[in-house]
Design a protein with these regions (language model features):
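Active-site acidic/histidine proton-transfer and metal-coordination neighborhood
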Residues: 38-42, 47, 58, 70, ...
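Histidine-acidic metal/acid-base catalytic patches
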Residues: 3-42, 54, 65, 93-96, ...
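Short beta-strand and adjacent tight-turn residues that come in two discontinuous sequence segments
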Residues: 50, 74, 102, 243
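Glycine-rich, proline-tolerant flexible connector loops at the mouths of alpha/beta enzymes
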Residues: 45-65
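The substrate-binding groove and active-site-proximal loops of carbohydrate-active enzymes
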Residues: 75-77, 106-113, 175, 216-220
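Residue-level recognition of beta-strand->loop/alpha-helix junctions
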Residues: 22, 49-52, 75, 141
Length: 271
């Protein structure tokens, strides 16, 4: 039984997306991917954000199209984005998306403010190449971006201030914002007009031998206020709503029961 912890459910968006990292174990070859795409399409997922592709990119895209799923963005290799923009744009054109993304910054970029600024400068510079060709770079956060990089500002604050808003958008992840101790709706409002893709991921806490531990979970099974989050997202111009669950599935290592639970919870919000 799905429970809604508010009095009224209001339809907010037209299409439900899936970050394919959620089904990464099924992305290893065309047969497994075909099977997985068919299953999630039947659950109501009509959009996807990629997380790499282990086989031919053209076939990968065709399999998604076969099941009525449109690619709306990617998490792509950072080195390829920086060093091989022409090939990267060619693949994204073939996939039919203008959102070229990374799942996070290189590890060394978090080490110091100087390193962070170097990463931002490089990402800003290459984003201009993509923008001239009709693309936009995207950045997906985790919780470490909410660590204070100096006495006053978090990494997220610095990126908010220094990323070029005309050429780079944020893929804001609801779970990781909350796990970073920040206010999800406040960040959606702060980034108004700069979030094309919102990652829908719930968070709960579990008791592990007396230790209270945060854990991602199915939409509606955690502690986030989805009515408020989705209303704020709609009001601020979010274009794509993409479910992601990295792990901790209802059925062991099988993600499908969890993805169906999230899709079922979100169906009343779909126009």
């Amino acid at each position: 039984t799905i429970q809604y912890f508010f009095s009224e459910v209001i339809a907010m968006f037209k299409n439900l997306g899936l970050q394919l990292y959620s089904i990464r174990d099924y992305m290893k070859d065309p047969e497994m991917a075909d099977f997985a795409f068919e299953r999630v399409a039947k659950m109501g997922y009509t959009e996807a954000q990629t997380a790499g592709n282990a086989f031919d990119a053209e076939l990968f895209g065709k399999l998604l199209t076969k099941h009525g799923i449109k690619i709306v963005g990617t998490h792509y290799d950072y080195g390829e984005i920086i060093n091989n923009p022409e090939k990267t744009m060619e693949i994204h054109r073939m996939w039919g998306t203008t959102n070229v993304g990374i799942g996070g910054m290189p590890g060394e970029a978090r080490g110091s403010l100087a390193n962070l600024n170097e990463f931002i400068d490089k990402f800003n510079k290459v984003s201009e190449i993509y923008a001239k060709n009709g693309f936009k770079l995207t950045y997906h956060n985790h919780n470490f971006e909410f660590v204070r990089i100096d006495a006053f500002k978090t990494l997220m604050d610095v990126m908010y201030e220094k990323f070029n808003p005309d050429t780079i958008s944020f893929v804001l992840d609801t779970c990781w914002v909350a796990a970073g101790g920040a206010d999800v709706c406040a960040w959606i409002e702060k980034l108004a007009g700069r979030i094309d893709i919102l990652h829908l991921k719930d968070i709960t806490v579990v008791n592990e031998n007396g230790r209270i531990t945060p854990r991602m979970t199915e939409i509606g099974n955690g502690n986030l206020e989805w009515n408020r989050i989705l209303k704020t997202a709609e009001e601020t111009g979010v274009k794509h709503y993409v479910v992601e669950q990295d792990g901790f599935f209802l059925d062991g290592n099988n993600p499908f029961a969890s993805l169906k639970a999230s899709a079922d919870y979100l169906k009343p919000f779909i126009k």
